[in-house]
Design a protein with these regions (language model features):
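Conserved catalytic cysteine-centered active-site region
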Residues: 33-37, 41-52, 79-119
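Conserved "HGTGT" condensation-loop signature of ketosynthase/thiolase-family condensing enzymes
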Residues: 1-74, 94-97
């Protein structure tokens, strides 16, 4: 593999939207303070995890790219929120998308800089 190309992106949000009112009841703050800084936030439901969200986003990116699963040379997932130590999120994405098993799949655990390290 010689470098990489970012051809398409995908995205996924957790199913539970946490309102500012709901959050202000659990911490000592106000809706106005939260809105000025973060607006809405989304939390995973019991059925969701970093892996399920990564799979949904990767499926969307693959569809948008026009590539076949066999065209993908490597699967890299950057997360600090893996639901399990093993299998890695990348291996779960690889399996769910039908990517070739003889290609690398790895997680990058580098917090906020994960995207930079992963690319």
């Amino acid at each position: 593999m010689k470098g990489f190309q970012l051809i398409a992106t995908g995205g996924a949000l957790p199913g539970r939207t946490v309102t500012n009112e709901e959050l202000s009841r659990t911490v000592d703050t106000s809706d106005a303070w939260i809105t000025s800084r973060t607006r809405a936030r989304h939390w995973c439901t019991e059925e969701e995890s970093a892996a399920t969200l990564a799979i949904a986003a990767a499926k969307q990116a693959l569809q948008r790219s026009g590539l076949a699963p066999a065209d993908i040379a490597c699967c890299v997932c950057a997360t600090l929120s893996a639901p399990d130590a093993t299998p890695s999120v990348a291996c779960q994405v690889q399996a769910a998308l039908g990517l070739p098993e003889n290609r690398p799949a790895l997680d990058v655990n580098a917090a906020c800089s994960g995207f930079l390290y992963g690319t």
